[in-house]
Amino acid sequence: FEARFRFVEEIIRWGADARTDGHHAVVRGIRQLSSAPVWSSDIRAGAGLVLAGLVADGVTEVYDVFHIDRGYPLFVENLQSLGAEVERVS
């Protein structure tokens, strides 16, 4: 799947120490992610971006969430039921 590491570019926008290495993504921990607009490239990456956005400092906007909708119906509602501050904006 040629786009499977596209999410790495997105988390780098947040300040993550990350890179791709052939068939692997290498991500090192940092103290705090800074919010930035990011784009979902597939179902799992999109869900991961939303979850990481919950701990990022500031407001995170995730675009192309239709990918998430395909695999996780009621994703936003489920996160809200767990106490997450997340909303869908049209």
UniProtKB/Swiss-Prot annotation:
GO cellular component labels: cytoplasm
Gene Ontology BP terms: cell division; cell wall organization; peptidoglycan biosynthetic process; regulation of cell shape
Organism: Mycobacteroides chelonae
Positions in coiled-coil regions: none
Lineage of producing organism: Bacteria, Bacillati, Actinomycetota, Actinomycetes, Mycobacteriales
Role noted for this protein: Cell wall formation. Adds enolpyruvyl to UDP-N-acetylglucosamine.
Gene (name only): murA
Keyword Nucleotidyltransferase carried by entry: no
GO molecular function: UDP-N-acetylglucosamine 1-carboxyvinyltransferase activity
Principal subcellular localization: cytoplasm
Keyword vocabulary terms for this entry: Cell cycle, Cell division, Cell shape, Cell wall biogenesis/degradation, Cytoplasm, Peptidoglycan synthesis, Transferase
Protein name, UniProt field: UDP-N-acetylglucosamine 1-carboxyvinyltransferase
Reactions this protein catalyses: phosphoenolpyruvate + UDP-N-acetyl-alpha-D-glucosamine = UDP-N-acetyl-3-O-(1-carboxyvinyl)-alpha-D-glucosamine + phosphate
Subcellular location: Cytoplasm
